[in-house]
Amino acid sequence: MKASRYPLVPRVLHWLMAAIIIPAWMLGFVAGRILPASASGSRHLLLGVHREIASSIVILIVLRLAWRATHRPPALPDCVPEDQRVAARALQCVMYLLMLTTPLTGWLMSSAYGKTVPVLWVGHLPALIGSSELAAPVIGVAHQFSAWALGVLMFGHIIAALLHRFGRRDSVLDMML
């Protein structure tokens, strides 16, 4: 059986989120891990852009989860073994969880540091918690852990999609195109 495509709405949400999550992840990584502390102006600028675009992920993942809760995804092609089907669905669930927890912990962290969370240069998200010098770094660690886990799974997801297309030459990637 050739796989059927996902409907337009989940395909658009998938690619829109990819177009936001990948640069947001890279900006956070560069600002947090590559730039030296002495480059505070550049770090501040990159983290500002990171927050602007990453905050929209909260809205998009809620829309995506709502769609997923009310619509069944198409079946994978018959050529995909059962163990890979189970693994794909389990990893998809974990990725959904991380796409929710990563921006939420970022939002919580910003709130705990007393910073506003801008959304696409048009507004701000309300603080989720009050300022807390004690909680902010702990939430920051949770945000970093969640972001790293999401980054690893995203990389694996991309590699798996490319292996399906160019290695196995099946129609799995076509489902989301």
Task: List the predicted regions and their residue ranges.
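Membrane-embedded alpha-helical bundles that constitute the cytochrome b-like, heme-associated redox core
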Residues: 1-177
